Amino acid sequence: MMVCFMAAVMMMSVGCHKESISPIIPDSPIIPDGALPGLFSVSATQRVYFSQGNLQYQASTNTWRFAEHQYDYVGTQTADGYGYYGGNVSGSDNRSISSTYSGWIDLFGWGTGSNPTLSSSNQEDYGTFVDWGSNPISNGGNTSNRWRTLTQAEWDYLLNTRTDASSKRGTGNINGVGGLIILPDSWTLPSECSFTSGFCSPSGYTYPDWTHNSYTLAQWAQMEAAGAVFLPAAGGRNGTNVYHVGRYGNYWSSTPDDESYAAYFMYFSSYNLSAVGYGSRYCGSSVRPVQDN
């Protein structure tokens, strides 16, 4: 069996620690439909809004939407070989991916904006990138070409290069759902919340460990209103096999690796992060669109 995600280079693992973040007066822009309020630098000259949740697709109605909440993901209800399964979108399972499926899916092969239910394991079927954001997204303005996917360089800039990058990212959980938290450029911590940057190394067999930051739904509502982004660890898909749900997060970039028919993605677990991982294009990963400011 081929391994979907072949490498995750430039890994960074940081022990549990706290870093203070100086409050900055937030921006007051007009927030696009379907977007979160924070602005995030993805290059020296470009800032973006993140969508309100991961991208989802319903084949039976040809409908695209953003997840209702940032912590929502489809996942699967069938355990993988490691015993991992999960998801909180009722009546939906990524294992059921097909052109007629009436549930929702949210793990897509690379560049499948024009063919979101493609589940072939033939690399050549994924040769041309079509951005998922080129489609009308029902709760994201519902017109074409409003949204796009970050490039590999933009993921890297966001997570590693922008001002205070390392102090504005960390793992955690929202009401038990694990994932990666990213803070906006201008950030004021809500008075009833806390945030600890970085990651926790696994201890013994306690893996994954998403307790680095823990939020109730009420606490997360305050964090989100202040601009925080949460990317759930929604796992991956190979054909109709879904794996590592709740253990890893894999988020596509729009950047191909033409020499190997792979593509770049942003990868994280509860204890590390890579902005420049790469893997086979046929492997299903999460998509979190952005809109340019």
Language-model region placement:
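Bacterial Sec-dependent N-terminal signal peptides
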Residues: 12-39, 289, 293
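Short, motif-level signal for alpha-helix interfacial/capping segments enriched in acidic residues
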Residues: 126-133
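Bacterial N-terminal signal peptides
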Residues: 3-13
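C-terminal, surface-exposed recognition/capping segments
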Residues: 35-37, 44, 48, 52-59, ...
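Intrinsically disordered, low-complexity segments enriched in proline/serine/threonine
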Residues: 25-28, 118, 186, 192
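Intrinsic disorder/low-complexity segments enriched in polar/small residues
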Residues: 3, 19-20, 69-71
